[in-house]
């Protein structure tokens, strides 16, 4: 019974509720105090008027006698501690009590000179009188120090971040300076437009009756800022791609305290003698199967130990690799992975440790490798065989393909990648499009300010979202082309440089020709002076989308994977079914960086990585990572639980609100392209196209229609049967051929 009580009380949510109730009870006791109620100093036969009864009357009298009005610091501290416990921001009990006592003594001393009638002692209580008499022996100016000391204690008690306060003051000052500059600029611009004397040159305004296609564009920088036109020329008719979030609504980076601390499991690695004994057993097993050689090095990691085996001359690598199952059986190991170590004349034989070391995400985020600013989009993958942190840069990959069966740790790995980006970038710097057809894994992130749209769960909307990403990519390339840069980093650097120098970027666009002189007419357009954020598209289950709209998804992902890197758009695509109909050759060719968790067969491992080995992994975050250099590394992923993700998302939702773009998932009216998603409209469009093909090409075979429309065999057969019912083609004859009944055009 005591075990379950301790387990319940150890829950941070339960502790938060208990502290909140205690604080509310103390506030009720203090506010309903009556000097005539029974207490330590008075006796009465009447029932106390205190809302908590006799206990409340005695407790309130005790608190007012000792601390005076400073007693209200006690419930305030309870409320602050309750909030910290709820969000997992723990501090030691000694520090909590010590800070509260300092605040009580300081406040009581400051209030000791105030006399009040409704409390038994003065406003500072007995503690205030004693402390005040003690301090007055030295100097009266000590009260100034007490005021400052009380302020510091209250700031620590309320956990007000000085960095957040200073950043707010700096942002407020910049905002006020900007407003004053804009006001003065508008006044001087209006005064300059009033001409006291006529000028010699008359101003001419050329107006064209219709918009003509621009012939050439020129970019220039102006030293003086000009007001942006009300309706600037846009690259396409849709609303701006990624709206700027106001500074007041930018969500702060989540504190590291939201992640749980590393747990000390007292996992002891094998001793050197044990490793040597295991190496001798391994050599004995290899000799039994006719493989000669010797072990030259042993690398002990957190999960597996790698034995570098140098085979004898003339031994084929495939012969040793094929013995992985036999070695695991002979050594009573869960699994054995054998692979060539790049750059060495040895084979790496990886055997699992007796005790597995578990590590959390917090210890990897605190490493210098993650804090390195040269890594633009850091993804925390885990630790390698030597126990060193492995932080990959998504900007250099530039896209990532993830595969793994259920229970292999794929979802935890994706969560670790997302959290690592959330701890680096604010919503102004990085945005997400999350596609989750299973409506399970990514739903926890719904509502965070980093999202461009709510988590997409419908396959039809997923196709529209990918189309929007393609159009956004093309729009960004036009914007980068206008100022002469090649990638998003150069674009943002140029925009930032122009903003610091208080200038705007303008471009001259030729809109037509003067009908009288024949000279070109130019219009000056001010470009949008906002930095472009990174956009990360996360697709949790690719197989579901490929089953519904395979060709459309494949073409859109191919276009994004080929071109979106320079535009700052990156894709993380995951699937639990790494078969050839999901991970097609087109997708593999455009995703050089891949991660494979544990899979069921060697075929699946070859599909995702091009070689076997993933089927020998241990699961629970054990993965093989292939970077864009085609070098495969074994990595052990960190563990991040649902409670940590919930704390992070709740914090982000409280500090910022998302600004969704409806165009991401809305099918535009002018888009006539049909998507085969199984509804009646797309079937009708396909049928009309099939009839047109039969009429024009005079061919009615199912295979020909299948190739022409790029659809499945069953769909093509249904279309031909429908044409047969409507009298467009005849039934098949004894050879299977059909006669076309439609007249030729």
UniProtKB/Swiss-Prot annotation:
Positions in the Cytoplasmic compartment: 163-745
Membrane topology field: Multi-pass membrane protein
A cellular-component GO term for this protein: plasma membrane
PROSITE patterns documented for this protein: FTSK (PS50901)
Residues in FtsK domain copies: 387-606
Record's subcellular location: Cell inner membrane
Signal peptide start and end residues: none
UniProt record, GO biological process: cell division; chromosome segregation
Spans through the membrane: 15-35, 62-82, 92-112, 116-136, 142-162
Protein keywords: ATP-binding, Cell cycle, Cell division, Cell inner membrane, Cell membrane, Chromosome partition, DNA-binding, Membrane, Nucleotide-binding, Transmembrane, Transmembrane helix
Residues annotated to bind ATP: 407-412
Pfam family, one: FtsK_SpoIIIE
InterPro entries in the cross-refs: AAA+_ATPase (IPR003593), FtsK/SpoIIIE/SftA (IPR050206), FtsK_4TM (IPR025199), FtsK_alpha (IPR041027), FtsK_dom (IPR002543), Ftsk_gamma (IPR018541), P-loop_NTPase (IPR027417), WH-like_DNA-bd_sf (IPR036388)
Keyword Manganese attached: no
Known function: Essential cell division protein that coordinates cell division and chromosome segregation. The N-terminus is involved in assembly of the cell-division machinery. The C-terminus functions as a DNA motor that moves dsDNA in an ATP-dependent manner towards the dif recombination site, which is located within the replication terminus region. Translocation stops specifically at Xer-dif sites, where FtsK interacts with the Xer recombinase, allowing activation of chromosome unlinking by recombination. FtsK orienting polar sequences (KOPS) guide the direction of DNA translocation.
Name used for this protein in its record: DNA translocase FtsK
Source organism per UniProt: Rickettsia felis (strain ATCC VR-1525 / URRWXCal2)
Native organism taxonomy: Bacteria, Pseudomonadati, Pseudomonadota, Alphaproteobacteria, Rickettsiales
């Amino acid at each position: 019974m005591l075990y379950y009580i301790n387990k319940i009380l150890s829950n941070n949510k339960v502790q938060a509720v208990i502290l909140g109730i205690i604080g509310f009870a103390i506030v009720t006791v203090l506010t309903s105090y009556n000097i005539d109620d029974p207490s330590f100093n008075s006796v009465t036969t009447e029932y106390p008027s205190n809302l908590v009864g006799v206990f409340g009357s005695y407790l309130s009298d005790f608190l007012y006698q000792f601390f005076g009005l400073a007693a209200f610091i006690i419930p305030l501290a309870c409320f602050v501690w309750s909030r910290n416990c709820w969000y997992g921001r723990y501090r030691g009990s000694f520090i909590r009590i010590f800070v509260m006592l300092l605040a009580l003594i300081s406040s009581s001393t400051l209030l000791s000179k105030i006399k009040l009638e409704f409390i038994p002692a003065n406003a500072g209580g007995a503690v205030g009188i004693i402390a005040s008499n003690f301090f007055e022996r030295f100097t009266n100016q000590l009260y100034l120090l007490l005021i400052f000391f009380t302020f510091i204690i209250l700031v620590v008690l309320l956990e007000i971040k000085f960095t957040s306060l200073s950043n707010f003051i700096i942002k407020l000052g910049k905002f006020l300076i900007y407003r004053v500059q804009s006001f003065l600029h508008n006044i001087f611009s209006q005064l300059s437009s009033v001409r006291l004397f006529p000028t010699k040159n008359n101003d001419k305004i050329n107006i064209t009756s219709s918009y003509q296609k621009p012939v050439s564009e020129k970019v220039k920088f102006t030293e003086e800022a000009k007001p942006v036109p009300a309706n600037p020329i846009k690259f396409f008719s849709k609303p701006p791609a990624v709206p700027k979030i106001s500074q007041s609504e930018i969500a702060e980076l989540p504190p590291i305290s939201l992640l749980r601390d590393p747990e000390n499991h007292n996992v002891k690695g094998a001793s050197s003698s044990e490793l040597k004994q295991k190496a001798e057993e391994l050599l004995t097993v290899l000799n039994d199967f006719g493989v000669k050689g010797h072990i030259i090095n042993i690398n002990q990691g957190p999960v597996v130990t790698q034995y570098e085996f140098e085979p004898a001359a003339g031994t084929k690598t495939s012969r040793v690799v094929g013995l992985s199952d036999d070695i695991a059986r002979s050594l009573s190991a869960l699994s054995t992975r054998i692979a060539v170590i790049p750059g060495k004349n040895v084979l790496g034989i990886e055997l699992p440790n007796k005790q597995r070391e578990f590590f959390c995400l917090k210890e990897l985020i605190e490493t210098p490798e993650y804090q390195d600013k040269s890594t633009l989009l850091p993804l925390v993958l885990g630790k390698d065989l030597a126990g060193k942190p492995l932080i990959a840069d998504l900007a250099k990959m530039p896209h990532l393909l993830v595969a793994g069966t259920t229970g292999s740790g794929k979802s935890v790995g994706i969560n670790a990648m997302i959290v690592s980006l959330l701890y680096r970038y604010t919503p102004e710097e990085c945005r997400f499009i999350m596609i989750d057809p299973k409506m399970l894994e990514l739903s926890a992130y719904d509502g965070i300010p980093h999202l461009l749209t709510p988590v997409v769960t419908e396959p039809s909307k997923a196709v529209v979202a990918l189309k929007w990403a393609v159009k956004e990519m093309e729009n960004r390339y036009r914007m980068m082309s206008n100022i002469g840069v090649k990638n998003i980093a150069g674009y943002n650097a140029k925009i930032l440089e122009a903003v610091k120098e208080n200038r705007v970027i303008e471009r001259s666009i030729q809109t037509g020709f003067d009908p009288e002189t024949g000279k070109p007419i130019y219009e000056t357009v001010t470009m949008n002076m906002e930095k472009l954020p990174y956009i990360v598209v996360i697709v949790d289950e690719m197989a579901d989308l490929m089953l519904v709209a395979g060709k459309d998804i494949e073409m859109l992902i191919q276009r994004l994977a080929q071109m979106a890197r320079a535009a700052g758009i990156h894709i993380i695509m995951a699937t639990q079914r790494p078969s050839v109909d999901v991970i097609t050759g087109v997708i593999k060719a455009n995703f050089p960086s891949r991660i494979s968790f544990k899979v069921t067969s060697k075929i699946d491992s070859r599909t995702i990585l091009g070689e076997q080995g993933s089927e020998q992994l241990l699961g629970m975050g054990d993965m093989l990572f292939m970077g864009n250099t085609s070098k495969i590394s074994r990595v052990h992923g960190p563990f991040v639980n649902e409670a940590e993700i919930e704390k992070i998302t709740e914090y982000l939702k409280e500090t910022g609100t998302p600004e969704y773009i409806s165009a991401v998932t809305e099918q535009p009216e002018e888009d006539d392209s049909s998507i085969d998603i199984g509804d009646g409209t797309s079937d009708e469009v396909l049928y009309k196209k099939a009839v047109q093909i039969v009429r024009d090409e005079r061919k009615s075979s199912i295979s020909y229609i299948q190739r022409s429309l790029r659809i499945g065999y069953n769909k093509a057969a249904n279309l031909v049967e429908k044409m047969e019912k409507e009298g467009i083609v005849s039934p098949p004859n004894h050879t299977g051929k059909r006669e076309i009944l439609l007249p030729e055009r």
